[in-house]
A protein has these predicted regions:
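Short alpha-helical segment
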Residues: 35-36
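Receiver (REC) domain active-site loop signature in two-component systems and cognate sites
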Residues: 54
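Active-site beta3 strand of CheY-like receiver
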Residues: 44-49
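Two-component/phosphorelay signaling modules centered on CheY-like receiver
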Residues: 10-28, 96
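C-terminal output helix
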Residues: 105-115
Length: 120
């Protein structure tokens, strides 16, 4: 599978990318949501891992742009965040249109659970 990670934290990008590569997947990374919109539109990704809190543009705003763009509207997107309250998670998934949520710090088990939900 092919994934895109959008996260301003180099540590978080590297941790998630390393785990996905160990699992045998192809991974691209973006350090900002500003750069990532064109990458999402140009690439064919099975899943986009999207950080919620980023300096230039948060994940909620970025995802709204993805959903409003017909070529990317159906892109499978998973929010990644250290925010763990049910209200924040539900807001992100339901209101902003994310397909799932991956808590930080990531681990192999949580990644495998998210990957198991990707539609074939």
């Amino acid at each position: 599978m092919r994934f895109l990670i959008i996260d301003d934290s180099s540590l978080d990008r590297h941790a998630l990318a390393s785990l996905l590569e160990i699992l045998g997947h192809e991974v691209d990374v973006c350090a900002s949501a500003t750069d990532a919109l064109s990458v999402v539109a140009a690439g064919k990704y099975d899943l986009v891992f999207l950080d919620v809190v980023m300096p230039e543009q948060d994940g909620y705003k970025f995802l709204r742009k993805v959903r409003l763009n017909p070529p990317t509207a159906n892109q499978y997107v998973v929010f990644c965040s250290s925010k763990k309250t049910p209200i924040e998670v539900n807001y992100g998934i339901q209101r902003a249109g994310a397909n799932d949520y991956l808590p930080k710090p990531v681990n192999r088990e949580s990644i495998e659970q998210v990957l198991a939900k990707i539609p074939a």
